[in-house]
A protein has these predicted regions:
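Glycine-rich FAD pyrophosphate-binding loop
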Residues: 26-49
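Rossmann-like flavin
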Residues: 93-94, 107-189
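Conserved flavin/dinucleotide-binding core of flavoenzymes
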Residues: 327-451
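N-terminal Rossmann-like FAD-binding beta1-loop-alpha1 element of flavoenzymes
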Residues: 6-33
Length: 451
């Protein structure tokens, strides 16, 4: 094969692009990955910050569901430390969830709280209709396409209990990147069946970036990985992608290929390939489905574990807070992410709306109020290491996980991968690598290496 010619060019080194590139390189396709930054991994990379190893986006990863399988298929080892314990903080108290039946237990807690409250104030005892909710839940999981309302409206059919609504809003916001009053119920139910709640998750002991480099290494065995080399154009000839222009140093290089896989996001892909090459129908779908969401990522450093105080490995979901909906004590799970004698905790903060630009100053203020209230030892033993607001126009802002874009584009031989191409019910890095696997399979079936 000629220099400057590859079977596949992958634009961007997120986990979707890395997965597709590694699978194809392993299958004999000469592959080039171009990354505009100096760091591999996208939102699955690792940032060195004041001696700490912090994730650039994704914190906990799912075991299986495409990630583990991809590493196995390319001959690399995926190293992950599982987190066996899950807690919910409800009404100021921490409840540990069983390995199975977490939803049932959560509704039982809500029922008991409602009964106890009614006993205190007198009057008719009214529980939160837990069994009725679970029955409707099972039915809706089996037929999610029939649910046309928001998840909050679906739940209101069975209860107006505020605590129950807070719990489900926390789940929707943390996992699906949308409040229960924003997200369609049809996008929520498939997640429970496909991803099994929050139990099969863990942290990579050496940081996500370390694991992403393993996939990049596979690509290098049958191709190249260029960092600090942004793609400036996707070359389209007669409706077909035939390569890319890449800025490498002070010059622009043309690279020819059979296939172009873009992990740059659909909007950037359209910009690189030229909007005139995309149908109005595709552009309409993109405008409707591609909705970057705002979020605040917070990291707290401390001299001792702030939660759990015994330093055990766990994840906590929080209901009824101002903004913080989940906490992960990273160094209790993966000690290497903090310097010796230090600890670091991650907190995910959900803005009031995932659909519009957030007021960054106000969201940071509310997040800090939550952190100082939720972590009593923070003022004495810790400090807020970093709070990063990512608004809808931030370079690393993800799209919501409601309804994904197709991998195929109107341009032949051009495919999109990443968290905007999520299958229904699969979110985050798991959904992104799933898109990479699907793209790799399309290439395997339609193109021959070295052709």
């Amino acid at each position: 094969m000629q220099p400057g010619k590859y079977d596949v060019v992958v634009i961007g080194s997120g986990i979707g692009g890395l997965g597709a590139g590694a699978l194809l390189a392993k299958r004999g396709y000469r592959t080039l990955m171009v990354e505009q930054t100096s760091r591999i991994g996208g939102r699955c990379a690792t940032e060195e910050y004041q001696g700490f190893k912090l994730p650039t986006g994704a914190v906990a990863l799912h075991k299986g569901l495409g990630i583990t399988e991809t590493y196995q298929e390319v001959g690399a080892e995926f190293d992950i430390t599982m987190v066996p314990r899950l807690f919910y903080r409800i009404g100021g108290k921490d409840y540990e969830m069983p390995s199975k039946g977490s939803l049932t237990m959560l509704l039982e807690i809500v029922n008991k709280m409602e009964v106890d409250r009614t006993k205190l104030v007198g009057g008719l005892i009214k529980a939160a209709a837990g069994e009725k909710i679970m029955g409707a839940f099972r039915k809706s999981i089996a037929e999610p396409e029939k649910q046309t309302m928001t998840f909050r409206d679906w739940l209101l059919q069975y209860t107006d209990n505020e605590v129950a609504h807070d719990i489900f809003d926390t789940i929707c916001a943390t996992i699906e990147c949308g409040h229960s009053y924003e997200i369609p119920a049809a996008a929520v139910f498939p997640w429970f069946t496909k991803m099994g709640g929050l139990r099969e998750v863990g942290l990579t002991p050496h940081g996500n970036g370390f694991e992403m480099e393993k996939l990049a290494k596979v690509i290098r065995t049958n191709g190249d990985v260029w960092t600090d080399c942004p793609a400036t154009k996707i070359v389209v000839e007669k409706g077909k992608a035939s390569g890319v222009l890449v800025r490498k140093g002070d010059s622009e290089t043309k690279v020819s290929s059979q296939v172009v896989i873009s992990n740059a996001g659909p909007r950037k892909t359209v910009e690189l390939a030229g909007a005139n090459n995309f149908s109005e129908d595709y552009m309409r779908i993109m405008r409707l489905r591609l909705r970057p969401h705002p979020v605040v990522l917070a990291f707290v450093a401390s001299d001792r574990p702030l939660w759990p105080e015994d330093g055990s490995a766990a994840i906590m979901m929080l209901a009824g807070t101002r903004r913080v909906t989940s906490i992960i004590p990273m160094s209790s799970i993966a000690p290497e992410c903090a310097p010796p004698g230090q600890h670091v905790l991650f907190a995910y903060a959900s803005p009031k709306s995932y659909c519009v630009r957030m007021n960054e100053e106000e969201e940071l203020r509310q997040t800090e109020l939550d952190l100082r209230e939720l972590l009593p030892g923070l003022n004495k033993y810790g400090r807020i290491l970093k709070m990063e607001p990512r608004n809808i126009d931030h370079d690393d802002t993800a799209t919501n996980a409601w309804f994904g874009m197709p991998i195929e584009t109107p341009v032949k031989n051009l495919y999109n991968v990443g968290d905007a191409m999520l299958p229904l019910g699969v979110v985050g890095a798991t959904g992104a690598i799933d898109s990479g696997r699907r793209a790799a399979e399309i290439v395997r079936k339609g193109f021959k290496p070295g052709a």
